[in-house]
Amino acid sequence: VPELHRNVVKVIEAGRSLGVVVEPRSYPQGAKTAQDAADAIGVAVGQIVKSLIFGVATSDDDVELVMAYVSGSNLLDEKKLAAAAGATKCQRVDADAVRQSTGYPIGGVPPFGHDNELRIFIDPDLLTHPEVWAAAGTWNDVFPIAPDVLATSSGGSIVDLKRD
């Protein structure tokens, strides 16, 4: 059995502290896109949780980082995310900001176990599946989770984020 990456261990431990069993599966070729991940796992692309981090700007130009969990079959509507966060606009942040705020690389951000607490917004389309798959700390590692457990364990708010 190959040794687990330290990020995966961190996700397993964070899950345990929340009462969530994390059983990671590794895909050495990686899962750079939601479709790649779905194909590797053998599930519908809508069952892949895309963890997206944005900076939302309030009227006084303070920028807060927030996270959106979006179904792999949907595109995020940035205006909807900004509105949900009570902000005027939002923008993507770079890889360094993602790693600094969560402790994980882009493509590997799990639903919990982040270095800093971020507000989380969840695409309701994820809740239509019996099981969804989220990153487990690296580009190559994912784990299955029931969508209601994803919502409660992450403390996220369910809000329409889908680009129409």
What spans do the regions from the language model cover?
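Extended, low-hydrophobicity, polar/charged segments
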Residues: 1-164
